[in-house]
Amino acid sequence: MRSLTLILGLLAGVLLANPPSSTMKVVFSDDFNGDALDETKWTYDGNKECISLKGGKLIISLKQRPDGWQGSAVSTRNKFTQVQGYFEASIRYNGNKGHHGAFVVKNLEKTEPPAAALYYECFGEDKLVPWARLADNRGVRDVHPPKNGLNLTPGLVTKKFNTYGILWNDRGFAWYFNDRQILKMDKLDVKEPMLLHLGNWVSDFEVKDLVASKLPDDVEVDWVKIYK
């Protein structure tokens, strides 16, 4: 059985090894310094009205519609994918409950098993959850770390930008926070390329906790880099 192994707490201990990017080359990047989203790099995976650029940052907002609250996302779908490598972004996550920010490295939805989706999700109030959804000949299953989250200093991921990274190599998958490896998973024989997805979503299970008076509560992305 494949499992996620917690390497260290975000504020406890230091991994002395260099980050994966130190031995790789950048093959995709965006610093969001333009006037509009660069559609040669990104595909809208939701409502375009929720996506904007401001002050050199990608802003992913929520929008109220007659049928409820709607989030959105952008991804490199149909623009950039690769087999293995290191996917990295500088993100400030949402501060409140009722919706969740997402940094995801995944295969296309119609990819035949084995396939994977590797997540960093923040459910507000500094609840950051790294996890994986795997598909193989045994079916689809979700794999979560112990306690289904990480112990964080209040405001660490919701008031500051931090660097989130996901590594995919021959040995498996690993999650990095500010260049420190915090989680790893042993090998799944995924062969198809993966894309990068950045989102701010409202799911049915959490919408009851969404408080309109606390909006806007955007997810902001300062930059993205993908290495090979």
Question: Which role does the model predict for each range below?
Answer:
Residues 18-228:
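GH16 jelly-roll
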Residues 5-14:
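Bacterial N-terminal signal peptides
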